[in-house]
Amino acid sequence: MTTLTAQQIACVYAWLAQLFSRELDDEQLTQIASAQMAEWFSLLKSEPPLTAAVDELENRVATLTVRDDARLELAADFCGLFLMTDKQAALPYASAYKQDEQEIKRLLVEAGMETSGNFNEPTDHLAIYLELLSHLHFSLGEGTVPARRIDSLRQKTLTALRQWLPEFVARCHQYDSFGFYAALSQLLLVLVEGDHQNR
């Protein structure tokens, strides 16, 4: 990632964490199709590796705006993909992909973080990884903690996430017939890969 700042990358991770943690409400649905969001997407597309993934997400958002009962349909997609059994779903948990669910707990402790009691999901949920990455990128931008320490923890987090994210994304593509969450997951995968290469 060359054109995006640490804070901008942190914002993308925080935004993705929010979208993968719960169904979109009416306000989020309006926001994702707003002119402000179009500007944000344009900024993300200035990073060449993200361009195709953002284009696809914009296509899904455009289709979403003309979808009947868009919020209800998207909520059904979210539920079917992320809350059902793993037979025809893309469960957003490291443990669903035979990964060590304790790894994220160790990473959170190392970062001096803990999960919120308001988030009623297991600690190995995708959103927790993304919130941690967001926190680490914000910390890099602040310069209060040695960058080497933050970067080491960022790489550990990315490595742990990369163990199962490709399979999660493949399952999103396989089972998300509308394609919004498939496009969102593809953007996440490209972001994580670019972030990992930016050592």
Curated annotation (Swiss-Prot):
Keywords: Chaperone, Cytoplasm
Main location: cytoplasm
The UniProt record lists the keyword Kinase: no
Annotated localization: Cytoplasm
Superkingdom in the source lineage: Bacteria
GO cellular component: cytoplasm
Chaperone is among the record's keywords: yes
GO biological process: protein complex oligomerization; protein folding
Protein function: Involved in the biogenesis of TorA. Acts on TorA before the insertion of the molybdenum cofactor and, as a result, probably favors a conformation of the apoenzyme that is competent for acquiring the cofactor.
Family membership noted in the UniProt record: Belongs to the TorD/DmsD family. TorD subfamily.
Protein name: Chaperone protein TorD
Gene (UniProt): torD
